[in-house]
Structure formats: structure tokens, C-alpha cells
């Protein structure tokens, strides 16, 4: 554990853009080092007080769906090298589960999520801000595959949600947040050159912090 505050790398981009692939590529490169991943997806607001018919109306692509206050609190605690208890979201019940995941502080924190660059409070806590930029057609195919396989959705429901929610929210909130990125990575996890550049940059920042 270092004596300076951890390095925070923010990785944003639309749903299905390849954020997870970029995150994994960076994480794998530094495997064996002190590094963790903190996903914004875990910080959807608790909705246990709402009836199921209300929960089903949740717009998961709107900034107000996230409990960024808790995410910021946890990120600040990790920056102070304190353990946090990450919530777990149940997409079948559309609310938080009773489960929590203990997260130990590390020297490198990868913060991943569709709207992490939309909140200036989160941006202020990041050392590097990335935006993964991928063609819309590819993003919808990836989202369809994920939601059907991992979240028990039907193809019709995924397409309906994309047309009526995901695409308009992407255009209204996610795409505009791209201007806050330090680096834009086209083609997601397939862009090995951009990932190699990022790995080198992160290594340089870590070295500078150690030598402070």
C-alpha cells in the first residue's frame, strides 16, 4: 500500500460500448499489483420501498437512477485507504439485494460506468478520464446479448427499451459527457493501441506518486 492517495481511472461510455473489455484489459495488465474495479452498476438506488409495478418503470440509463452520493462516499473512503461495503443490485427484483461485498482499498481504482463523467463530483476524484466510443449498432447487439443472457430479458423487451429509453438517454446524457474525457477510445476493447497507451500512462502516474 502506498503512502499517497490511490490513482483513480474513470472509464465511461454507452451501454455495450466495451467499457468492461477496456477495464479488464487494464486490470489484467496490472494483475499482481494493488488494483480494484468499482462499478457504477452496483450503485443503483434502493427501491425496496416501492411496489414492483413502480420498480418496473425504472429508467436505468438516467442519472437519477444512481445513488452517486453513496458511490462518492465510498470512493472517498477508498481514497483514504478505508474498506467499504459495496451494495449489490438485483435486476430481477429491481432493487438492492441484502448482499454486500467488502472492498479493500488499493493503490489503483478503476471506476467504470455509463454516467460517471456526467457527475462533476465524480470527475473531480479521477486522475484519468476515459470514454469508450463504439458504433451504436454494435452497442445494441452487445446489450441485447447481455440482457437476454444475464438479466432474463426477452429480445422484444430489450429492443423496446433501447428505442424508447437507452438511445434517447445516451444522446441526452452519455454522449454529451464525452467532452469531459481526457482520452476517447474508439472501438472499445479491440483498440489495443489505445489500451497500451493507457497502460503506459497509468504506470507513469503510479511511478510519479511513488517518487513524491
UniProtKB/Swiss-Prot annotation:
One Gene Ontology cellular component annotation held by this UniProt entry: cytoplasm
Residues given in the record as ATP binding sites: 13-20
Gene3D superfamilies linked: P-loop containing nucleotide triphosphate hydrolases
Predominant cellular place of this UniProt entry's protein: cytoplasm
Places the protein is found: Cytoplasm
GO molecular function per UniProt: ATP binding; cytidine kinase activity; uridine kinase activity
E.C. number(s) listed in UniProt: 2.7.1.48
Record field: catalytic activity: uridine + ATP = UMP + ADP + H(+); cytidine + ATP = CMP + ADP + H(+)
Source organism, top-level taxon: Bacteria
Pfam family, one: PRK
Gene Ontology biological-process entries: CTP salvage; UMP salvage
Group of enzyme by EC: transferase
CDD domains in the record: UMPK
Keywords: ATP-binding, Cytoplasm, Kinase, Nucleotide-binding, Transferase
InterPro entries linked: P-loop_NTPase, PRK/URK, Uridine_kinase, Uridine_kinase-like
Protein name: Uridine kinase
Species of the source: Bacillus cereus (strain AH187)
Lineage: Bacteria, Bacillati, Bacillota, Bacilli, Bacillales
